[in-house]
Amino acid sequence: MKTQIVKLLADNPKGLRSRTISYTLGINFFHLLDLLSEMQTEGILYRESYVDLANAENYILWKLNS
């Protein structure tokens, strides 16, 4: 599953939100969060946060460390 996440993020260099990854790969959202946390600890991924000022929403994008 981690390989699929890496491939998906490699195809989307601007990053993806957790829910987008979950829907695309068809895996349980909470299981995905555990995997993303593991991958961040392993140094494979990092999180980038930003606020969409127009909608006042916080976003967290997952990206590959390169």
Specify the residue positions occupied by each region the protein language model found.
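Short helix-to-turn junction characteristic of helix-turn-helix DNA-binding domains
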Residues: 9-13
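Short amphipathic alpha-helical interaction segments
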Residues: 27-38
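Glycine-centered, phosphate/nucleic-acid-interacting loop/turn motifs that mediate DNA/RNA or nucleotide
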Residues: 43
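Proline- and acidic/polar-enriched loop/turn elements at helix boundaries
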Residues: 21, 34, 51-52
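Short, cationic-aromatic polyanion-contact patches
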Residues: 1, 17, 48-66
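Short, leucine-enriched amphipathic alpha-helices that occur as contiguous helical runs
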Residues: 2-6
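Short acidic, hydrophobic short linear motifs in intrinsically disordered regions
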Residues: 14-24
